[in-house]
Swiss-Prot record:
Alphabetized GO MF terms: 3-deoxy-8-phosphooctulonate synthase activity
Protein name: 2-dehydro-3-deoxyphosphooctonate aldolase
Superkingdom assignment: Bacteria
Reaction(s) catalysed (UniProt annotation): D-arabinose 5-phosphate + phosphoenolpyruvate + H2O = 3-deoxy-alpha-D-manno-2-octulosonate-8-phosphate + phosphate
Annotated metabolic or biological route of this protein: Carbohydrate biosynthesis; 3-deoxy-D-manno-octulosonate biosynthesis; 3-deoxy-D-manno-octulosonate from D-ribulose 5-phosphate: step 2/3; Bacterial outer membrane biogenesis; lipopolysaccharide biosynthesis
Family: Belongs to the KdsA family.
Higher taxonomy: Bacteria, Pseudomonadati, Pseudomonadota, Alphaproteobacteria, Hyphomicrobiales
Broadest EC class assigned to this enzyme: transferase
Catalytic activity, EC: 2.5.1.55
Amino acid sequence: MNKSIAPAPVVAAGDVKFGNSLPLSVIAGPCQLESRAHALEVASALKEIATRLGIGLVYKTSFDKANRTSAASARGIGLDAALAIFAEIRDSVGLPVLTDVHEAEQCARAAEAVDILQIPAFLCRQTDLLLAAAATGRIVNVKKGQFLAPWDMGNVVAKITTAGNQKVLVTERGASFGYNTLVSDMRALPIMARTTGAPVIFDATHSVQQPGGKGTSSGGEREFVPVLARAAVAVGVAGVFIETHPDPDHAPSDGPNMVPLRDFEALLRTLMEFDALAKKRPGAGTI
């Protein structure tokens, strides 16, 4: 292991740059990788929106939802089937790709076809997983655990940089507040920026999730996604993470907190306006 080094203040996935003082970028896509056709449909629509608005966009989706509430819940198509789809989105659609990994053994294989490996919030302290993700040389996006203080993310990031990888993003996705409820403390955004030195992302859709709130699945309050997203962008962040779907009410996972694809562009336009205002003057909007 190397001596711990500082994470890079600007991280680039292809042409998409993440930096706390740079113009806003976005990570977006459906919760679950449902099929090749569905993935390409959504990715193509998001590519068109990003091009029209002039914003950097990374496509996200999950090949396996390993922490579903119920054993009967749909988990996804699996890594073997996903790799070719990830590569097609990168090469044919022209978007960088993010996916989450749950086991150290998945990291090297997933890294063959994606630009960003994401560490789920529940696994953010798993040292072997963090080291395996870091060893791929890909960008590592770590979601802060719902149980973790924002200042504790410094130790999490140090595990990655100690392995020699400076390409780290940290994501806020809410904190547990009693049962089946999360709250977003906007102080966490500048605290994580200060204690980690990494670009900070705000996950606007999982922050409105109600974990296990529907008995055998999680609930959500998608009407509050724009509210929290605007608040985070007004603070000044490197990017926002927004799950979106053509028909979220019939999605296999996280439907209650996903933004309908038809509403995505209007939301993004608003967030870009907030971001421009927050970062209008030199030094302003830098968390």
